[in-house]
């Protein structure tokens, strides 16, 4: 993960910094849903990438106890029956999808402890690396909001310019 540049997707708490690869975290927390308004539906994002997702979870589970947090509405077996992780189901409005809230309910961080967190989409990157031997930072994003003419899901590489994505899809002159 370090050599491939993917370790930077792992965040250490407290302090929300890139994780120390030499540290032994109390646990690794992956939230597979987001209750923020306009957030992408992870079950849609996951379609066709279930194998990479599980491989990514397997890799994380070798580093520390790993928790996969899902929403009560999610039904994809890749989430509900994920292997080598502790699956916890959450219900409720925002901030139920916030990984910090989830950590506080499952295993609060005590003085001197650290935990690592990842976005579920980033777990797919890790799985792809182990399944293919190459880094592929393609991700599906939701193009949504009041200034979007036609809401849609778009596939792009992390760091890609959004100019082409916005072209013809958002209100002209909108302050984006």
Residue ranges of each PLM-predicted region?
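Buried, small/hydrophobic-residue-enriched core segments of structured protein domains
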Residues: 1-176
